[in-house]
Swiss-Prot record:
Basic and acidic residues bias locations: 45-129, 149-166
Record field: compositional bias (Basic residues): 1-12, 181-190
Record region (Disordered): 1-166, 181-212, 268-289, 391-455
Biased amino acid composition, Pro residues: 193-204
Keyword tRNA processing in record: no
Protein name: Uncharacterized protein DDB_G0279979
Regions crossing the membrane: none
Amino acid sequence: MTGKKKNRHQKKSSQDHNNEPLTEIDQTTDETTTTTTTTTTTTEEETKNENTIVENKDEDKKVEESVQEKEEEKEKEKEKEKEKEKEKEKEKEKENNIEKEEEKKEEEKEEKNVEKEEEKEEKQTKTDDNMWNNEDEIDVPTVEGEIETDIKDEKKEEKKKVEKEIEDPNKKYFIKQKKIIKRKKEKKVKPQPVQPTPPVPAPAPQQSSGWGNWFSSIGNAVSNTITQIARVDLDDSDEDSEEEIMVEEDIEVSKKEYERYHRKKLGLPLSDTEDSDNDNDNGGDDNDNAIMNAIDNGVFKTADMIADSLYFAGSFLSSGFKTVQDNANIENVKGLTQEVSNISLDTKNKISNSELYEKSQKIASQMMDSSVDALESVGQRAYSMFSTQMKNKSNNDENNNNNNNNNQQQPQQQQTTSPTLSTSPTSPKSPTTTTTNTTTTTTTNTNNNNNNTSTNYEFNINESIFEAGEFDSSKCAEHFNITKFIQDIEKLSVESTMKAHQINRKVISTSSIKSSVDLVLNEIKELFENEELPENLSNSNTLSFSNIHIFEIEKKYREFFDKLQEFTPQLKNQSIELGLCRGLEKIYQLTAIGLELISTIASSIPDEKAPSDVTNNNNNNNNTGEWAISKSNEILFTITKITQDIKLISAMLTEIIKSKQTPNSRKLLNNLHVETTNAISYIQDTKGGFVNICQIMYLNEIKFSLKGPTSPISTPNRKQQKS
């Protein structure tokens, strides 16, 4: 009880104590507690905020992870789809492979069936052949495993049979040999012919304006005649014709021949004596056949040569000289004759001990000589016909031009001196018929111009042909006669080719200096065909020909080139289109005068003679070759000089166009380059024709030196010719 009272007393005292007013110390403690509570609340709020931030970050991460997972799932699905597609493709490939294998199997089956059919056919042919063979002939088995053993056994048995038969001295030996007999054919009942149309007679060859058509009409007439004759021959031959039949008969032979026959049949090797006997037995037949084949080949080869020459002449007369020049190359003719000689050499090696060889050799040589002579005569006749027609045509054209000039002389005096173009509104502008003084001189009959006096050439350098921007290269070439000069050079080249071939065949081929002559001819050819110029070309800068007309045209060329160098810079004062048009006209005019000079040189070269100091020298052949090469160098220098002059004028025009800088400058420069290239090609293409022309100059000198002394004609110096 006392304890409970004490507790109650303590509780009351504590309550009383709590109800008492606070002291200062108590107040301070309260303040500290309040501050601590506030700080704790702030820290709690901060921690809450941090927790919320962390939670937000975690949520963002979770969102990103979920997005990535979705993307990964999509990629996995895509990969699965790709794998499915690959599996499908593999299945398709398997199906295709299976189909291919099935096709291969079917093809193999078909091939096997074809092979079986072929084997059956072979068996049938073998059985048919065995009917004609010897009764004792061995049938080769077709079983794959036992073929070799069966063949060996059967060969042994056959050997024994042959030995037994040979041992009997009184036995006669027979072999079966195939023989061809002839019998008359049975007459065939010809059906009654339906009323045929009357045969059209073969057209007679008619000379047309084109020589190629004339040759083709001859070919048609010949072919129609041949077909008609062939038909008549076939109709006649059907009545009493014979057919050949192969039969077998028994022939008695000697013991050696019988043994050799069976050894050949069994495929056994023959002895050396039997080989030599066999060669001697068959040698006569082989030799005769070889001779006949050689003669036949020679005849056909010659016929081909003549046919080629006729075709070649037809193309020559229809298409011009250039095609003929390519086809009439000496190397082509040499190739044909070389083939015939090879055939004769092979025949000679085979049948050198035969008497028939001498006869065949004479026949072949006579045949070749006559065929080549015929070829040359055909070519020369065709050439002479064509050249005379061309001369007549050119003379008629000159007469017509002279008449037109005389008729137009009076109205031209009333007009201005500057030439004009045709100004018809419906037709394109073309050059007038009036030409400059530069093209009045041509190369016809240049051999007769040695005594002509030199003329003073006057050039109207301000002459115009085309209007600005209307330059036409083809019309300009015709205006300045460029095509005519080129045709003259090509014509001389073809004529020189034919003459060179004739001299080579008749004179050079039988002489002892053939090898040295061939060296000079090859050197001339390489000189013109080589793109690089020789080092000593500058030493040939002066012309030394016997034709005085060459030096007149050379003077004319130099005067025009000097005036053109003064005239070209003045084109800068005109419009760029007009200046280019005038410049191109002058380039083509310079080209025409250069071609006139080259053509005149070409026409005088075949008649050029070596000076006396060359022909009278002991070492005549070498000196003549050096003289011919020096002349060729002079021509090559002239061609090179004209080419460089054209390039110089073109370069001056290029500088004028570049200095003006117009929108059309690039186009105009391109046109200038194209036309300059065309003009240069006209000059450079003449080098190919000069190969044959210079070769015939050299061959003429060699021919005269071999046949006998000729009257020496010294080459005049240039100073003497000018005086």
